């Protein structure tokens, strides 16, 4: 979280998002999961279909994400959603930050052949996310995601273990 989400929130976040989310990331109070991959999309991230329709001060989400690591532990998700189908696929993507306890979100475990549970499919059924949860501009989430990936894919791999706060270790065991 500190390595990838914090820099992106610092760069694209509103003053309110920075004031609320950055201290929670630093303290480990929030556990984040990533809502990128979708069923049937393979490695083509821009082909995502999780639909987000603007309704007043909210986006209404319908669809699903898959291979979502630790969604069953997370209380927040950073998520790419489809807000427009016009133009190139990358131009109709919006980056949202959302609460995993929002009504309409269902986390379904994916068990490995060894019986382990690390991955999940996450379903969104009429999930309302406030517009204030948007990071960056509507339909410019591709830019935000690329920025995040520069941090996520850089640096020593051992730092990735810092993204799960110590408070979650009891739940894992």
Give residue spans per PLM region.
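Conserved small/polar residues in nucleotide/adenosyl-binding loops
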Residues: 1-4, 160-166
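Internal helix-loop-helix
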Residues: 3-19, 23-29, 69-76, 151
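Buried hydrophobic positions in well-ordered alpha/beta secondary-structure cores of metabolic enzymes
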Residues: 14, 34, 61-63, 96, ...
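A short, Trp-centered hydrophobic/proline-enriched beta-strand micro-motif
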Residues: 28-36
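A structural signal for short hydrophobic beta-strand segments in well-ordered beta-sheet cores
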Residues: 50-53
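A short core secondary-structure module
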Residues: 62-108
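A glycine-rich, basic-preceded beta-loop-alpha segment at the flavin cofactor/substrate interface
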Residues: 108, 113, 120-162
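Hydrophobic alpha-helical segments, chiefly the membrane-spanning helices
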Residues: 171-173
